[in-house]
């Protein structure tokens, strides 16, 4: 039997999603909790492996089990055994053809900047702070130059292992709610550090250090060293993963929760 779960986590205390030796990971904590409820060793497959310090409100995983449990066991039961910064949001039994990673058609990331004079004491690990005024309209206009299928070498981490730098951005929107600036970006797939590298360059445009058409120039360079520094991980969230409608997976609000209030 194959089961899918929606997972939310604050990544500040973890060395990323993926299980690693001698350091704590989100995957390790989730598998330990699931194994207690299933009464056997559980290994999960995820939609996207987030880096150290990166969060998620919309991670999707699947696992195999022969254990017959009510849905409440896979939600409340697993949550009772998880640290407070990781939570199961939903559960659904899925067809054996479903794969959390390979069935996904798109991933939606959200980068949140607190644009204020002083860094916040609360939510500090769930935001990126930038003190200079940012022009949201210029940032949004600049972001539209990244839409479609393009070579994103200039926004690719040097150690990225992807076979191709060509990805397709379906949607890129930048909005503001009070002092929060929100960068929403959806693509078929992402290169390592791609969203944070794009965010870093958008910030340079927003504060007036670079012109609105700078991203177009960076795409043409195909050179990571020409773009801005990588934005900090604390502001980044994997908020949603798209799948074919045949799987009929739940679609809760993207979050994070403090933006929904």
Swiss-Prot record:
InterPro entries linked: PsdUridine_synth_cat_dom_sf, PsdUridine_synth_TruA, PsdUridine_synth_TruA_a/b_dom, PsdUridine_synth_TruA_C, TruA/RsuA/RluB/E/F_N
A biological process from GO: tRNA pseudouridine synthesis
In its keyword annotation, does this UniProt entry include Amino-acid biosynthesis? no
Active site feature: 51
Transcription regulation among the record's keywords? no
Enzyme Commission numbers on file:
5.4.99.12
Reaction equations catalysed: uridine(38/39/40) in tRNA = pseudouridine(38/39/40) in tRNA
Q: What does the record give under GO molecular function?
A: RNA binding; tRNA pseudouridine(38-40) synthase activity
- Binding, substrate: 109
Q: Which NCBIfam families match?
A: hisT_truA
Q: How does it assemble?
A: Homodimer.
Family per similarity comment: Belongs to the tRNA pseudouridine synthase TruA family.
UniProt cross-references to PANTHER family, sorted A to Z: PSEUDOURIDYLATE SYNTHASE, TRNA PSEUDOURIDINE SYNTHASE-LIKE 1
What's the protein called, per UniProt? tRNA pseudouridine synthase A
Provenance organism: Psychromonas ingrahamii (strain DSM 17664 / CCUG 51855 / 37)
């Amino acid at each position: 039997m194959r089961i899918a779960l929606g997972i939310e986590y604050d990544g500040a205390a973890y060395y990323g999603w993926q299980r690693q030796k001698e350091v704590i990971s989100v995957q390790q904590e989730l598998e330990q909790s699931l194994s207690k409820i299933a009464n056997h060793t559980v290994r999960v497959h995820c939609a996207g492996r987030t880096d150290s310090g990166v969060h998620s409100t919309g991670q999707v995983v699947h696992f195999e089990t022969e254990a017959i449990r009510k849905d409440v066991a896979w939600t409340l039961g697993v949550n009772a055994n998880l640290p407070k910064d990781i939570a199961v949001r939903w559960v659904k039994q899925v067809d054996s053809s479903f794969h959390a990673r390979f069935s996904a058609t798109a991933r939606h990331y959200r980068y949140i900047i607190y644009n204020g004079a002083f860094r916040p004491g609360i939510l500090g690990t769930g935001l990126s702070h930038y003190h200079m005024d940012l022009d949201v309209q210029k940032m949004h206009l600049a972001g539209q130059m990244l839409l479609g299928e393009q070579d994103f070498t200039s926004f690719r981490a040097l150690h990225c292992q992807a076979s191709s730098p060509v990805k397709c951005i379906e949607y890129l929107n930048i909005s503001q709610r009070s002092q929060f600036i929100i960068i929403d970006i959806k693509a078929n797939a992402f290169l390592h550090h791609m969203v944070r590298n794009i965010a870093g360059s958008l910030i340079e445009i927003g504060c007036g250090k670079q012109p609105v058409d700078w991203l177009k120039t960076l795409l043409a360079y195909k050179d990571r060293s020409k773009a801005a520094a990588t934005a900090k991980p604390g502001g980044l969230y994997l908020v949603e993963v798209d799948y074919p409608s045949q799987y009929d997976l739940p679609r809760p609000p993207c979050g994070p929760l403090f933006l929904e209030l």
